[in-house]
Amino acid sequence: MSHALNFVSLPSHHCALRPLAQAAAVLCLAASLPAIAQQAPATPAAEQTMLGVSVTAGRDATTEGSGSYTTGVSNTATKLNLSLRETPQSVSVLTRQQIDDLGITTLDDAVQSITGLVMQKGNFTGDSGSFSARGFPIDNILFDGLPTSLGANGTFNGDNDDLAIYDRIEVVRGATGLMTGSGTPSAAINMVRKRPTATPQASFSASVGSWSNYRLEADAANALNEAKTLRGRVVVTVQDKKDFVDVLHGRNHQLYGIIEADLRPDTTLTVGAHYRKTDNDGVSTGVVTAADGRFLNLPRSTYLGSDFDDWRQTDKTIFAELEHRFANGWKAKLAATRKTPEIDTTFSGINRRGDTLRFNSQSYRAELANTSYDAYASGSYSLFGREHELTVGASHRRSSKNSYGGWAPYSWGAAAPVLDPFNWDAGSVARPVINYAQWRTASITEQSGVYAGTRMRLADPLSLVLGGRVSWYKDDAGYSVAREFTPYAGVVYDLDKQHSVYASWTEIFQPQAATDAHAQPLKPISGTNYEAGVKGEYFGGALNASAAVFQIRQQNRGVDDLAGPNPCPGSTWGYCQRASGEVRSEGVELDVAGALTPDWQLSAGFTYVKAQFKRDSDPANIGKDFNSRYPRQQLKLATSYRLSGAAQGWRVGASVYGQGATESNDGTYHLRQGRYAIVGLNAAWQIDSRAELRLNVNNALDKHYYQSIYSDVFGNMVGAPRNLMLTLNYKL
C-alpha cells in the first residue's frame, strides 16, 4: 500500500524572499520544516511514497533511481545501520540524483557541494584539490567503507576521482577514529560504488561544454544468468577537455566492472576492478602576485608554466567482498581493496629574487599503493528485555610510496629564465633534460585495529551509542604506536517521532615522528570532538534536517622545545620538539536535504568554523587562526523543481556557493580574497520516457574570484568563469 503526499504550501514564518545574511535563509527554512510535516498526511513511515521519490521500508541506503537528495541509512560513522537521525554525529550525503542534477563529475566538485567541507585547488597535484573540514585537513577517504591514506595536507596523491562509478558520497564530520583509526578530527569521506542490479538497465550520455569539453558515459547492469544469482555491471567514461586557462588540456578515460555472485541464498561474493587513466597537458600552479601580495589583475586565462608541463596518471583498483547472512539476522562481511596510482609529471615553478621572478622546472615519478582489509559482524541482541545492535570487527591497511625526480639545471639559480607575468610565453623555454636521480623518497606505513560499537535502547525514546577501537601503527622509519585506544560515545533522545536531540564525544589520533630532547618520538596528536545537536526526519525519511554545535581540541601537537638544545641531537639544525601544542576549533553546522514537496528537492547547508591556536611555542600565534586560508563561513545550496501543467516534463534548478574571506600572510606578503558567492543554474527537459536533455550553467553571474590563495608565487587558483555543459541522457 502506498500514499501520495499532497503538494503542500510553505508557511511564511516571515520568510520573505529578500537578501539575508548568510545562514538566515537556511534557519528560516529549518524553522518551516515542522510546519511542512504537519501539513502532510499522517501516512505510516513504512508506506510513504512521495511522487517521484521512493522511501523504502527496508531503510535502503542506495540512492540511484530514488530521485532524492537524501538517503535512508548510513553506516559510515559506526558500521551500525542507522538513519541520519539515529546517528549522533553530523552526516551529509551527496546522492546520485544531486550529482546528476548539478552535472558534477569529479570529487573536487562533489566536495565543493557538501555541507561543511572546503575544497581548495591543489598545487603540483594534477587536477585535484585538497580538502578540509572544521578547520583541519581531511586525510581519510574511504571506498565502500574501507579507509585509504591521503597525502600531506589532505591531497589525495593527485587523484581527482570521476564520479560516474559511484552511487553516493557519505561524509561524517568531526573525529572518526572508531572506523578510520588514525587521522585528523576533520571528516571522513566515504565513496560508495554503484552495484549490479538483478533487472536490466542501461544508459548512455553525451555532453558538450565550454572550452571544448566533450564527455561520453555508458552504464549497463543486468543479471548474468536465468536464476539471477550472478549479476554484473559495467561503467565506461571518456572525456576530452580544454580549460579557460591557456595550454591546459586534459584527456581521461575509465573502465569499471563489478560482479556479484550468490554462492548460496545466504552468501554473496562481490569482485570488481576499476581502471582510470589521466593525461593532462599543462600543470597550473596558479598565478603570482606583487611582492606584497597584491593581485596583479592578470587575465583569467593566464598560464605561467611551460607548454611541456604534463601530468600522466594511471589508477588501478581491485576489490572484493564476501558477505554471509545468518538465520538469526546477523551478518558477517570480509572486504579488501587495493589501489595503485602511478604518476609521471613535469611542472614549472616560480621563485622570487627581490623584484625579479625566475622560472624553474621539475619532474618526478611516483608509485603508490594502498591495501585495506576489513572484517566485521553485526546484528541485534537482547538485553534487559530490549533489542540492541552490535558490530565487532578488525581492519588493517598498508600504504607505500616510492617517488623520485629532479629539476632543470637552471632551477633556482641566477641563470634561470626571467618571468614577466604580463608577457609570458609558455613556449619560450626549451624542455630541459632532467636527471630523475637527484632525489628519492620511499615510505611504508601500516596500521591495524580492532573495534566494536553498539546501540543500546535504554528506553523507548533514549538510545546510547558506545564504541571503542584499539589501534597499532608503524612505519619503515622505526616509528610505532601500540594499543592506542580511541573511544566513541553518543546519546540520542527522541523528542517525538520526527525530532531527536543528541550529544557525542568522539576521538582520533595522529602519529607524529618528531623527537624530543631525549631522542624519543613524540606521543600521537589527539583529536577530540564534542558535539551536540538536533535532527529532524520528515515524510518517512524523504527529508532530513540537522543543526549542530561542536568543539574540537587537537592536543599534543609538536612544538619547538625552546628550553632544549639547538640543534637537536641527531639533527643538523632546529630545536627538538615537545608534544604540548593545541588547536581548538568551534563552530555551528546547519544541514537540510531531501524533498520539501513531491516535486521539490533541496540541499542546503551553512557552516561557521573558528579554529585557533591555544598553545604554541611561539606566543605570537596564540589566538591566531590555525589556517586563515580556510573560510570561516560557508553557505551551500542546491535545489531542483519539477514543473507541471503546460511545462510538464521540465525540471529547473539552481545552486549557490558562498564563503567568507580568506587570507595568507607570511610577514612579507599579505593575500586576501574577500567573501564571494557564485550561482549555478540548470534545466532539464524530459523528451520522452527514455531521453532527457539537461543544461548546466556554472558561475552564471561570471564572478571573478580566486578559488584558493597560497603565496606570492604559486597556489593562487583563479575560479572558473561562466561555463556551460549540455548533456543528453538516454536510457536503453
Language model segments and positions:
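C-terminal beta-signal and adjacent terminal beta-strands/loops
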Residues: 4, 657-665, 681-732
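Extracytoplasmic beta-strand/coil segments of soluble accessory domains associated
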Residues: 69-92, 96, 108-147, 167
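Short acidic/polar hinge/loop motifs at secondary-structure boundaries
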Residues: 119, 130, 146-173, 191-193
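Outer-membrane beta-barrel translocator/receptor signature
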Residues: 149-150, 165-167, 178-257, 263-267, ...
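Acidic/polar loop-and-plug regions of large Gram-negative outer-membrane beta-barrel proteins
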Residues: 239-243, 256-325, 336-368, 413-443, ...
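Structural signature of Gram-negative outer-membrane beta-barrels, strongest in the C-terminal barrel
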Residues: 260-262, 368, 387-391, 395-399, ...
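Membrane-embedded beta-barrel scaffold of Gram-negative outer-membrane proteins
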Residues: 321-327, 331-337, 341-347, 526-595, ...
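Gram-negative outer-membrane beta-barrel transporters
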Residues: 460-461, 578-666, 701, 729-731
